[in-house]
Amino acid sequence: MIKRLIIIILLFIWSCEEATFEQDNPLDPDNPDYDYPTVTFISSIAEGDTIHVSDISFDWQGSELVAEYRTKLDDNDWLEWNDQLSFEIEYLDEGAHSFSIQGRYSTGVSSIIVTKNFIVDAITGPALVFFPRRKIASQGDNVTFQILAEEVYNLSAAEFRFTFNPSALQINSLTAGSAFGSLGEVIFITEIDNNGGSVSISTAVFGD
């Protein structure tokens, strides 16, 4: 009976000992020295700057242990997470844009999103511009472009022609836009040559 009692007491004392663990894991939020991930732009334009080209590069850096980043232009979807620290954007359209970055640890903890707003003013008008400048499509897709009059004022008539590669695409239709507003009756004459790869447009407005 005495031996059994001693064994019981020893087991009880062992099970009540306080366990201690080293909290030195930098990715453990319970670590008193834990820092949340951060991302910072480097070597980029200032907030709200205007650029006079249609392409731009962004560079950034994350805090220690940030493993991946993702980026987003304007209201487009986020790109996939990767370990790149720079990104180049080409064929930007005229006007206001925003570029956003977010980083995360390997544990999945993400940083706050940082955003840089800027304006593209790459065209010195008067000029005719395709909008958007670039659109990526697959074979068989139908896509729509606009032709904009950039820095053109008091326009009453226009005539122009553009060419394209007929082995890569064909023009299905052309419609008049709203460049003339409500100034009067709009005349819109087009000629599409899908064999030769050219389009001619003549348009004018007749007011009262």
Show where each model-derived region lies.
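Sec-dependent signal peptide recognition
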Residues: I2-I8
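C-terminal motif of bacterial Sec signal peptides marking the signal peptidase cleavage site
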Residues: F12-S15
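Low-complexity, disordered linker/stalk regions enriched in Pro/Thr/Ser/Gly
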Residues: E17-G125
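Short beta-strand segments of immunoglobulin-like
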Residues: S43-T50, F131-A137, A149
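Short strand-edge motifs at loop-to-beta-strand transitions and within beta-strands
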Residues: L85-E88, V143, G197-V199
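Boundary/junction segments of secreted and surface-exposed precursor proteins
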Residues: A122-T144
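Low-complexity, serine/threonine/proline/glycine-rich extracellular segments that form mucin-like
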Residues: I136-L183
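Structured beta-strand segments within beta-sheet-rich domains
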Residues: L148, S182-D208
